[in-house]
């Protein structure tokens, strides 16, 4: 939100009380409390003006929080994000009348407490080093309380004065050339500088500035991240009001933010997920291909069976089949009952699908239409969000007369999850948790008294948590996942998430990728898009290009709106492309499971921006049409019918030993780091480059992701190995568990150097793993 007109003027009706002085402070163990006020000329300036209390804490090492409070008399009805904390890792030094230093790990906050010289400076540096690097901070006029007399609130008489709408404002410094990223799944420009962003979940598709998944956390190229700990609406002006600052404002009396330090983007993400929760793992079968009924298409048992037979006849591997909205009768979403006209024997039919070896997914949302038999029950028992007068909140957008389930009511949660458990008893393996963005936030009440405005974003988290925990209670953590559209802070604990409603265009394919890369910067390690696009019918060329991209995402789903996405309706050559892409992804399962386990521990996503993997190469920071798929594979999707694609190959430390990137499809084709390349590809290839010095476990014998990874296991080694490498082979049945640790190294032989791979527990059997050594030496 913008409050100024240039450097000198304020917008009409705006007043800002800027904090310029530390009136007093108190140090209590790991906490510093300061009372801030305006510029003080004499004692009279303490009257008729605002103060802001600042509380400095450190929830975890390397993270420092500042909480700003104007009025402290408000009700705290929640909700609050769940954050992990520890103690005993801070150091505080205080030079009276001059400064205060608050240290947490390498991160230090230096507060200038000299009269009328208030400044906060966050710096980083190694222990014992005098020279420290500034990350961000508050300089002149950057902490304030804003009053707006133009809002409806200001027209209401409150006591003897008219009340202004208040906002708490914090402006954080930026350095020259600094770039900003993240803030959830955002589909606009990948680099966020110059943008105005509202953290407010909306159902806006992928071609707008709105977002389904708003996360008030951004990462800076300067070596830090900022998390605004506020579940309600957060407004950020990222160099779009003050060109040297990020302006953060929230409606109301308090604002809390945390600065998270890291040597590189991966360390920042690790600390971020230490604070907000580690991403959960998903079952191996979920990495396979998903097929859906699409949205508004007419389908029945016969339609679905025909699709599945078509996949079998064409030797197209399929892991999951999904029933979208119209598995239920129209106007009755959700009643959790199969439409008997279309599925007269739902239980029997689901059993027959399971006999095909398929996992089954089904669509749900957190709403109950008035025509649903469940509406009267929910109304009678108080399971829905209510208006202030006690009536059920309803509207006609989406489902006629629909109500919204109140997940702050434990009884409502039990009622809702009881229907999910019944569906799981029928054979449903997972749920697509759609919607939860259009949540009312005015003139309503929740069962637990939560603040409606703070619940608007948080609601999606509750919804997904309730469904996910229902699944884990029955199937266990290693066999549970969602397919969710909306989320909030901490939602990485309830995977997977997909990009929402995109158009069937190359532009939408590119914006989907931007959204997925941005979301990954919040520790969401799994992500998918609607292959082929959701809105409209994709031309065959686009379908094939999106298949290539979609099968190089962590999760891969064929889904549309009014048209089906089975490949043969776009041409039999589309089936060939799909088959090749699915089989390639299945062969990569050992690699993907190992990368996912690392992401579970560290918060590093499977699909990651180039700068995350190569922060020393400044050319990687603006790149948003290519990505790293795990640590080893560079992917550059093709965004044109003609197949022309331009991509950048980053410099890597490994290249100092004259190692080179190589093509996945042609191991004789080599690429130098630090260069741009333009190529033309048909539909059987795209740029997939293998990192120099990397060891990638693969298995071409696998027919499904959950197959035995050891039978047929091999490794692809690019170039020489400077030191012994350990590769974890993850159990596909329990993706938290490591089956074997493979040790890969070089050794001298009579015939020269060779690469060997040993599996722990396999005595003397060096040949149990096939080695495909490219770029150097011999193949064994």
Swiss-Prot record:
Its EC number is 3.2.1.177. Glycans are attached at residues 48, 84, 247, 298, 443, 718. GO terms for biological process: xyloglucan metabolic process. One of its GO terms (cellular component) is extracellular region. It holds the Pfam family Glyco_hydro_31_2nd. CDD domains: GH31_N (cd14752), GH31_xylosidase_YicI (cd06593). It is found in: Secreted. The keyword Cytoplasm does not apply. InterPro entries: Alpha-glycosidase_related, Gal_mutarotase_sf_dom, Glyco_hydro_31_C, Glyco_hydro_31_N_dom, Glyco_hydro_31_TIM, Glyco_hydro_b, Glycoside_hydrolase_SF. The keyword Zinc does not apply. Its main location: secreted. Induction: Despite the presence of an amyR-binding consensus sequence in the promoter, is not activated by isomaltose. It catalyses: Hydrolysis of terminal, non-reducing alpha-D-xylose residues with release of alpha-D-xylose. Keywords: Glycoprotein, Glycosidase, Hydrolase, Secreted. One of its GO terms (molecular function) is carbohydrate binding. The active site is at residues 434, 437, 501. Gene3D superfamilies: Glycosidases, glycosyl hydrolase (family 31), Golgi alpha-mannosidase II. NCBIfam families: PRK10658.1. Catalyzes the liberation of alpha-xylose from the non-reducing terminal glucose of xyloglucan oligosaccharides. Belongs to the glycosyl hydrolase 31 family. This is Alpha-xylosidase.
């Amino acid at each position: 939100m913008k409050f100024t007109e240039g450097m000198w003027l304020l917008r009409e009706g705006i007043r800002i009380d800027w904090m310029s002085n530390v009136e007093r402070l108190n140090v209590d163990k790991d906490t510093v409390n300061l009372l801030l006020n305006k510029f003080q000329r004499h004692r009279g300036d303490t009257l008729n003006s605002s103060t802001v209390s600042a509380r400095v804490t450190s929830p975890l090492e390397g993270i420092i929080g500042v909480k700003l409070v104007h009025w402290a008399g408000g009700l705290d009805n929640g909700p609050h994000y769940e954050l992990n904390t520890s103690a005993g890792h801070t150091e505080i030094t205080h030079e009276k009348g001059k400064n205060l230093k608050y240290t947490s790990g390498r991160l230090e906050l230096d507060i200038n407490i000299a009269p009328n010289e208030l400044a906060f400076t966050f710096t980083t540096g190694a222990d014992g080093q005098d020279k420290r690097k500034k990350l961000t901070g508050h300089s002149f006029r950057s902490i304030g309380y804003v009053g707006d007399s133009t809002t409806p609130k200001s027209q209401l008489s409150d006591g003897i004065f008219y009340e202004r709408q208040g906002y708490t404002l914090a402006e954080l410094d930026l350095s020259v050339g600094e770039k900003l990223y993240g803030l959830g799944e955002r589909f606009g420009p990948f680099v966020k500088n110059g943008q105005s962003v509202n953290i407010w979940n909306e159902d806006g598709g992928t071609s707008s500035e709105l977002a389904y998944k708003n996360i008030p956390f951004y990462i800076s190229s300067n070596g830090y991240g900022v998390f605004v700990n506020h579940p309600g609406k957060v407004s950020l002006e990222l160099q779009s009001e003050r060109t040297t600052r990020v302006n953060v404002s929230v409606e109301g009396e308090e604002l809390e933010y945390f600065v998270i330090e890291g040597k590189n983007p991966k360390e920042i993400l690790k600390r971020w997920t230490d604070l907000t929760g580690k991403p959960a793992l998903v079952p191996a079968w979920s990495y396979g291909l998903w097929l859906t009924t699409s949205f508004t298409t007419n389908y029945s048992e016969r339609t679905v069976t025909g699709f599945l037979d078509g996949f079998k006849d064409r030797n197209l591997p399929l892991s999951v089949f999904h029933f979208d909205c119209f598995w239920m009768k129209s106007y009755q979403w959700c009643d959790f009952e199969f439409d008997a006209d279309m599925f007269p024997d739902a239980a029997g039919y689901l059993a027959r699908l399971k006999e095909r070896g398929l996992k089954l997914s089904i669509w749900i949302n957190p709403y109950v239409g008035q025509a649903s038999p469940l509406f009267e029950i929910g109304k009678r028992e108080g399971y829905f969000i209510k208006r202030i007068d006690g009536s059920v909140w309803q509207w006609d957008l989406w489902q006629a007369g629909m109500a919204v389930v109140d997940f702050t009511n434990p009884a409502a949660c039990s009622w809702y999850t009881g229907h999910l458990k019944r569906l799981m008893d029928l054979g449903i393996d997972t749920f697509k948790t759609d919607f939860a963005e259009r949540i009312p936030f005015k003139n309503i009440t929740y069962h637990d008294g939560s603040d409606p405005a703070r619940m608007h974003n948080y609601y999606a988290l509750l919804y997904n948590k309730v469904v996910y925990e229902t699944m884990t209670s029955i199937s266990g953590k290693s066999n549970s996942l969602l397919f969710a559209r909306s989320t909030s802070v901490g939602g990485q604990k309830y995977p997977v998430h997909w990009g929402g409603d995109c158009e069937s265009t190359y532009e939408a394919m590119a914006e989907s990728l931007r959204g997925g890369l941005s979301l990954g910067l919040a520790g969401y390690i799994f992500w998918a898009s609607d292959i082929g696009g959701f809105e409209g019918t994709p031309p065959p060329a686009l379908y094939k290009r999106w298949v290539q991209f979609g099968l190089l995402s962590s999760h891969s789903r064929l889904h549309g709106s009014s048209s089906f996405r089975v490949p043969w309706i776009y041409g039999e050559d589309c089936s060939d492309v799909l088959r090749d892409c699915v089989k390639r992804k299945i062969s990569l399962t050992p690699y993907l499971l190992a990368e996912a386990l690392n992401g579970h521990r560290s918060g590093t996503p499977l699909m990651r921006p180039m700068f995350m993997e190569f922060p020393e190469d400044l050319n990687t920071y603006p790149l948003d049409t290519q990505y790293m798929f795990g640590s080893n594979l560079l992917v550059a999707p093709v965004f044109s019918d003609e197949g022309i694609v331009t991509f950048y190959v980053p410099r890597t430390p490994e290249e100092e030993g004259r190692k080179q990137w190589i093509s996945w499809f042609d191991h004789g084709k080599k690429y130098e780091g630090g260069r741009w390349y333009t190529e033309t590809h048909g539909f059987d290839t795209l740029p997939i480059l293998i990192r120099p010095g990397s060891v990638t476990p693969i298995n071409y014998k696998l027919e499904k992701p959950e197959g035995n990874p050891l039978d047929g296991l091999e490794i692809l080694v690019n170039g020489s190995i400077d030191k012994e490498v350990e590769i974890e082979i993850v159990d596909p049945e329990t993706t938290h568990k490591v089956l074997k640790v493979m040790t890969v190294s070089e050794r001298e032989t009579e015939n020269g150097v060779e690469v060997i791979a040993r599996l722990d527990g396999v005595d003397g059997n060096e040949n149990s793993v096939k080695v495909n050594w490219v770029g150097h030496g011999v193949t064994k």
